[in-house]
Amino acid sequence: MIQKNTKIISLIILLIFSVNLLAHEESSKRVVILQPQHGENVNQTFKVYFGIEGMTLAPAGTYEPATGHHHLIIDADLPNLLLPIPSSSKYLHFGKGQDHTQLTLIPGKHTLQLILGDGNHIPHKQPLISKKIEITVRP
């Protein structure tokens, strides 16, 4: 009886540890806009630097696990997460695996947000989406 209880307790501890480890692995994956910072004032032409953790940047058309490429959303909402990310002036694709770009925007307030796409430009099953930042472009 004691041996059976010990096995059950061991299995429960192992299960809890596995769930915590899996949750940590998922939470350690993220994309972030490194520069500019939220609330920053920038010139009309400025650089945007992208960060990624827990995944590897790869060109579009790469279908290996834990890889993807950045898409920058400018002044727009998130796209449908089940479809390829649109390509337009509001949804910029960085299909060569780039980690930065230079933008020119009109003066005023703007929002920027990153989303990682897979080899087909579709967000991952656990989408990696940055916080939306707001910047002000100087005249």
Q: What are these model-predicted stretches?
A:
Residues 18-20:
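N-terminal signal peptide c-region/cleavage motif recognized by signal peptidases
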Residues 44, 106-108:
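A glycine-anchored, Pro-Gly-centered beta-turn/N-cap motif
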Residues 51-62:
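Short amphipathic, basic-aromatic surface patches that mediate peripheral association
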Residues 62-70, 129:
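Short coil-to-beta strand junction motifs in C2/discoidin
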Residues 79, 117-125:
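Short acidic/polar inter-strand loop motif in beta-rich domains
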Residues 126-139:
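Short beta-strand elements
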